[in-house]
Structure formats: C-alpha cells, structure tokens
Amino acid sequence: MGNCLHQAELSPSTENSSQLNLEDLWNFSYNGNDSFPEIDYDASLAAAAPCHSCSLLNDSSLPFFILASDLGILASSTVLFMLFRPLFRWQLCPGWPVLAQLAVGSALFSIVVPILAPGLGNTHSSALCSLGYCVWYGSAFAQALLLGCHASLGPKLGAGQVPGLTLGLPVGLWGATALLTLPITLASGASDGLCTPIYSTELEALQATHAVACFAIFVLLPLGLFGAKGLKKALGMGPGPWMNILWVWFIFWWPHGLVLGLDFLVGSKLSLLPTCLAQQVLDLLLNLAEALAIVHCVATPLLLALFCHQTTRTLLPSLPLPERWSSPVDTLGSKS
C-alpha cells in the first residue's frame, strides 16, 4: 500500500511558510507597496506526497528467506523419510497419509520461498512469479484443508472407517486447492525485479476472490473448528473435532488472512484509514504476518514429528497383544 519514497523533512519555518496566516490576510491592504505573502510551493508538494512506508521484507531480508527455505526443506524431507520408512512406528499414526501430505505441502512452500524473496535483482519473470505465488498459496491452502479434514475425521483415519479415503481425499483437496490459487496466479507478476500482486481495476475481482479465500481458510476455518469443538462439548453431543498439537499451524497463517483482508478493503477504498500512521501500521502488520507465515515451513515438520511421537508413544502400549506382535516396531525387532 504505502511506498518507500524519500520523505522530505520540513523545518518549522518551512511548515509555517506553507500556510497562510488568517490574521495577515485580514489585515492585508491593497497598497502599492504591499506584496502577496510568499508560499513555498515545494514544501506544499512535499506535504502532499504519498504516505511514507518502507517494507521490512526488503533486500536486506534475503538471508531470512534463504535460511527459512533451507531449514524447511531439510525438516520436511526428514519427516517424509520417517513417515515412509519401512517398518517404522510412525506409520501407526492415525491418518499418516494425511500427515505425509502436510509434509509435502510444507516442502513445496519451502522450495518457492526463494523465488518470491526480494534482493535477487532482475532475475524474476512474470511467469516465474505467478508460479511462485501459485505454489506458495496452494501449499498453504492444502495444508489448512488437510488439517481441517484430519481434525474432523479424527481417529477414524487410522481405523479404515472412511471408504475411499486413500484416493478420494487427496484428489478432492488438491483439486480444490488448484481452483483456489487461480485468482492470485492470474493477478501476480514481476514489477521492478520483485514478485508482487498486481493491483489494478481490471484485476480487482481476482484480488477480491483471493482475499476472501484467504480469510475463509486461514481465519474462519480454525474459528469454525474451535466453535464446533466447544458447541459439541457444551451440548454433550460428542467430542467434536480432534484437537491436537497440529492446530498450532493456524497461528502462523491466521494473522495473514486477517490482515490481507483488511488491506484489500483499504486498497479498494471500501474502508479508509484516518491517518498516515494507520497506513504505516497496516503495512508493518502485513510484513510481520508474511514473515510469520514463512516461518511455518520450518515449524510444520516439527509439529508433525511431535504429533507422531506423542500418538505412537500412547497408541503402541494400548494395542492388543496380537496387533502389537504385527506392528512395525516388533517386526523390525524380530528381523534384527
């Protein structure tokens, strides 16, 4: 929204010279010796300059993008290896195929982080930027929807009680994700060597659709899960959505969905900010929300590892003796 232009610093004398004194105008007389008050038009133009706002995620933040990408790829790859490792106890996690897809989504996000990072000069092209935004938001949408399904289905994921889950759920979720990413894919590109969404009247409908999608998935979805959990518990209708450590994921994206929606309202003139300071605060919140969203690619594999460790530690001792004999851990021990 705001720009990072050099803002002229006005001295008190300059500020006073840019305003007409009402008393001087009242006492003004049209004598030959009188002259019109001098107005500093340069100062007036400087005062009317756009609101000054510099981005936190500028060229100097490139190491942050690179570090987050590297750590995210490493952590996601490790979790995927442990989930697909033959005869390993993490395959006892309820719905471990869904967990594997979460790790894949986190890895995809980590891969495209450097593409959208500032400070890479003029290496960006519009096609590459559009692809980057497509994968960026597509992986985030997919992870949010997978978490919603994982919370709603709960332990049924590991009991084979959901027919068609193995193929139907991934196809449906990733297909919906592809549709949700179309607006930002078409409304993004490269500008001055930076990947950025394109704001124009022709693309306003696409930007509105993207803002609504982010608000619904990142803000309303977790609120709906919490509301359903509390309502079912209050009415005694059952346990409700399965609450676990994976819900922490929404903390990294909830601010982004909220602030992005507010920024669209301001940019489309549907809501006006009263002062320049309010605009600067909004720009700062946008940068902080984006940085927090980037950190999720490192946190998600850690959350998955913690969840698998907790569930397998509590699940394995509770299994009946014949099932424990056929579990991957015991099979691995017998082979060794």
Curated annotation (Swiss-Prot):
Residues exposed to the Extracellular side: 1-63, 117-129, 188-207, 266-287
Membrane topology per record: Multi-pass membrane protein
All ranges on the Cytoplasmic side of the membrane: 85-95, 154-166, 229-244, 309-336
One function term, GO molecular function aspect: C-C chemokine binding
Identification of the protein by name: Atypical chemokine receptor 1
Domain of life from the UniProt record: Eukaryota
Sequence intervals crossing the membrane: 64-84, 96-116, 130-153, 167-187, 208-228, 245-265, 288-308
GO cellular component, one term: recycling endosome
Role played: Atypical chemokine receptor that controls chemokine levels and localization via high-affinity chemokine binding that is uncoupled from classic ligand-driven signal transduction cascades, resulting instead in chemokine sequestration, degradation, or transcytosis. Also known as interceptor (internalizing receptor) or chemokine-scavenging receptor or chemokine decoy receptor. Has a promiscuous chemokine-binding profile, interacting with inflammatory chemokines of both the CXC and the CC subfamilies but not with homeostatic chemokines.
Keyword list, A-Z: Disulfide bond, Endosome, G-protein coupled receptor, Glycoprotein, Membrane, Receptor, Transducer, Transmembrane, Transmembrane helix
Disulfide bonds: 51-276, 129-195
Protein family (similarity comment): Belongs to the G-protein coupled receptor 1 family. Atypical chemokine receptor subfamily.
Coiled coil: none
Subcellular location(s) per record: Early endosome; Recycling endosome; Membrane
GO biological process: chemokine-mediated signaling pathway; inflammatory response; regulation of chemokine production
InterPro entries xrefs: Duffy_chemokine_rcpt
Glycosylation sites recorded in the entry for this protein: 16, 27, 33, 58
Keyword NADP: no
